[in-house]
Amino acid sequence: MASVHQVDIKTDAQTHYHKAMTEIYVVLEGVGEMELDGERIAVRPMSSVMIKPGCRHRAIGKLKILNIAIPKFDPADEWFD
């Protein structure tokens, strides 16, 4: 089972990771970057990024994204350093 939700990122997100969840971010609006394990990747509308379990990540910039979480999003599986 998966979940899909829209997220409005207004400020740079805090670096975090998930132990069990894979996420796919699809950028709907805005221009910014995704930071994956310290590597920055430029994103713009219709860019997509797959984030595997254990990957420390964050979004940088003002973005509207579609977040696809597999399995479905569980706030208990959100870990911060």
Task: Explain the meaning of each model-derived region.
Residues 38-54:
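Short acidic-glycine-tyrosine-enriched beta hairpin
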Residues 5, 28-29, 44-45, 61:
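A cytosolic small-molecule/anion-sensing beta-strand core signal
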Residues 24, 40-42, 56, 62:
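Well-ordered beta-strand positions in beta-sheet-rich domains
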Residues 1-15, 21, 68, 77-79:
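A short glycine-rich, His/Asp/Glu-containing loop-to-beta-strand
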Residues 53-78:
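Ligand-binding loop in jelly-roll beta-barrel domains
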Residues 18-20, 61-62:
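Short glycine/proline-enriched turns and hinge-like loops at secondary-structure junctions
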Residues 9-11, 45, 53, 70:
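Active-site donor-binding loop signature of nucleotide-sugar glycosyltransferases
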Residues 20-32, 37:
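Glycine- and acidic-residue-biased ligand/ion/polar-headgroup-sensing regions
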